C-alpha cells in the first residue's frame, strides 16, 4: 500500500484546487481535499486499489478496447486506481502505474485534468452531483446506496475541510 503525508496532500489541494472548474459557491481546494478524504483517507491509503469492473470480464473492460489494452499491458495494475484521488489509469493516457503511484504532483495534476475535462462536462450544480460523477461516472436521480453514502461522506469532508495557508506552497 502506498501513502502520502496528509500535509503534502492538503498542500497539493491548496496548490491545484483553485483551478478546478466548480459550481458557483463551492471551493475547489476543499472539493479536492474532500475527494482525497473519501478516496484515500487524505493520502493514507493510496492503493493501488483493484477495480473489478476494469479487469478481465468486468463491464468497463468488456466495453472498452483501451481498457483491455491497459490490462494486457499492465495486468491487474491496469485495472487499479492510484493516489489520493484514486485515479484510474484509463483516464490518464501516457502515465504508467508507477508514475501515478509514486508522484503526488502528477496525481494532483491528473485529478485537476480529469475533473476539468470529465466532471465539468456534466455541469454539476452541487457537491452531491460532483460526488456522483466522481464515484459513479455520471449524475443520476436514483443513485445506488453506496453512491448515496459516498456523497454523504463527501459532504461531511467538505464541511470540515479547512483551507490551507498559501504561504510556503510553491
Locate predicted features.
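Catalytic glycan-binding domains that act on GlcNAc-containing polysaccharides
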Residues: 2-169
Amino acid at each position: 500500500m502506498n501513502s502520502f503525508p496528509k500535509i503534502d496532500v492538503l498542500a497539493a489541494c491548496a496548490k491545484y484546487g483553485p483551478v478546478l472548474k466548480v459550481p458557483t459557491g463551492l471551493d475547489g481546494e476543499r472539493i479536492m481535499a474532500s475527494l482525497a478524504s473519501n478516496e484515500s483517507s487524505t493520502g493514507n491509503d493510496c492503493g493501488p486499489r483493484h477495480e473489478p469492473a476494469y479487469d478481465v470480464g468486468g463491464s468497463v473492460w468488456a466495453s472498452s478496447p483501451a481498457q483491455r489494452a491497459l490490462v494486457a499491458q499492465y495486468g491487474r495494475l491496469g485495472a487499479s486506481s492510484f493516489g489520493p484521488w484514486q485515479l484510474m489509469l484509463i483516464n490518464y493516457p501516457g502515465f504508467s502505474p508507477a508514475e501515478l503511484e509514486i508522484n503526488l504532483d502528477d496525481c494532483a495534476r491528473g485529478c485537476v485534468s480529469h475533473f476539468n475535462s470529465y466532471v465539468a462536462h456534466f455541469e454539476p450544480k452541487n457537491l452531491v452531483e460532483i460526488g456522483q460523477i466522481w464515484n459513479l461516472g455520471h449524475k443520476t436521480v436514483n443513485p445506488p446506496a453506496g453512491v448515496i453514502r459516498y456523497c454523504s461522506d463527501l459532504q461531511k469532508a467538505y464541511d470540515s475541510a479547512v483551507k490551507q495557508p498559501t504561504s510556503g506552497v510553491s
